[in-house]
Design a protein with these regions (language model features):
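A shared catalytic/ligand-binding motif for oxyanion handling
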Residues: 1-193
């Protein structure tokens, strides 16, 4: 666990019994771990990530992301609050996000060879709401993985859960997602493409 600073940040990592998790290193904005699954899944790399909430320091987050993806031959997954969106469709309300700011995040993702893990639930994972009803909604939280990881876990989905105590949606990763036939609320593709 990485503690919060005031009301911002903080990371917690929970896993199911039977999964072997070895934390390699951690800092204020990340948890870097190796996962040893059972049976056919072997070993893979996991990173819990928190992007700097200060826009002036966001470039430091992208440099950290690039350094974490460095020379690693294992399949890997990164989940977290990146405090950034990839494209304008990931934001509702408020001022328009500068394109260059989003592009820097996308460049770091591309540098690491990461792809979106499909999600189930509301598109936006963060809500800012004033007493007068004004809202800003953004998709700040996500799961990204290498193609090798996605091949290893083809049914994996990230669930955006509802919360009454946080402005962020809790995230739950399921490796064996079976879609419901009644309601379509999942995303297997990136709306920014």
């Amino acid at each position: 666990m990485v503690p919060s600073i005031g009301l911002s940040g903080g990371l917690a990592l929970f896993w199911k019994e039977g999964i072997k998790m070895e934390v390699n290193k951690s800092g204020l904005s990340h948890i870097d771990a190796f996962v040893r699954g059972d049976g056919n899944f072997g070993q893979w790399h996991f990173i819990g990530f928190y992007g700097n909430p200060d826009m002036a320091k966001r470039a430091e987050s992208w440099e950290l992301l690039k350094s974490l993806c460095g020379p690693n031959s294992l399949p890997w997954l990164i989940i977290g609050d990146f405090n950034e969106i990839i494209c304008v469709s990931e934001k509702y309300g408020g001022a328009v996000r500068p394109i260059r700011q989003m592009a820097r995040f996308k460049e770091a993702i591309d540098f690491c060879g990461l792809r979106e893990v499909g999600f189930v639930g509301p598109q936006y994972t963060w809500l800012y709401q004033k007493h007068d009803g004004f809202q800003i909604r953004e998709r700040l939280d996500r799961a990204l993985a290498t193609q090798e990881w996605l091949t290893l876990f083809p049914s994996a989905k990230l669930f955006h859960k509802s919360s009454s105590v946080s402005d962020h949606s809790p995230l739950l990763l399921s490796f064996l997602h079976k879609p419901k036939k009644k309601k379509k609320s999942s995303s297997d593709s990136n709306p920014c493409d």
